[in-house]
Amino acid sequence: MGMPSMPELLVILAIVVLLFGAKKIPDLAKGLGSGIKNFKKAMKEDEESEVSVTKSEKIEEAPKNEKSASTPIQDTTKQA
């Protein structure tokens, strides 16, 4: 059971035309295309928001690292 051959694809296409009609098929294809376009757009926006969050986290961490490096070290040893 591999890929359908050309005659099988033609039979499937004929059944689709009979079920939906020739006028409805372009509308279905247009709806499918716009759905895919919206899905890709949402995926791209999600990736961009993750990148911006990561950049803002790095910017917030940078000043914290500078403060810890500049604080003096206290002597905590006990003298006898």
Curated annotation (Swiss-Prot):
Q: Which domain of life is it from?
A: Bacteria
- Region: Disordered, residue numbers: 43-80
Which cellular component, as a GO term, is one annotated location?
Answer: TAT protein transport complex
Q: Matching InterPro entries, A to Z?
A: TatA/B/E (IPR003369), TatA/E (IPR006312)
Q: What is its main location?
A: membrane
GO terms under biological process: protein transport by the Tat complex
Output one GO MF annotation. protein transmembrane transporter activity
Biased composition of type Basic and acidic residues is found at 55-67
Residue ranges, compositional bias (Polar residues): 68-80
Q: Which residues cross the membrane?
A: 1-21
Q: How does it sit in the membrane?
A: Single-pass membrane protein
Compartments where found: Cell inner membrane
- UniProt keyword terms in alphabetical order: Cell inner membrane, Cell membrane, Membrane, Protein transport, Translocation, Transmembrane, Transmembrane helix, Transport
Q: Which Gene3D superfamilies match?
A: 1.20.5.3310
| Family named by the database record | Belongs to the TatA/E family.
- Report the protein's function: Part of the twin-arginine translocation (Tat) system that transports large folded proteins containing a characteristic twin-arginine motif in their signal peptide across membranes. TatA could form the protein-conducting channel of the Tat system.
Describe, as the record does, how this protein assembles with itself and its partners: The Tat system comprises two distinct complexes: a TatABC complex, containing multiple copies of TatA, TatB and TatC subunits, and a separate TatA complex, containing only TatA subunits. Substrates initially bind to the TatABC complex, which probably triggers association of the separate TatA complex to form the active translocon.
Q: Which NCBIfam families match?
A: tatAE
What name is this protein filed under? Sec-independent protein translocase protein TatA
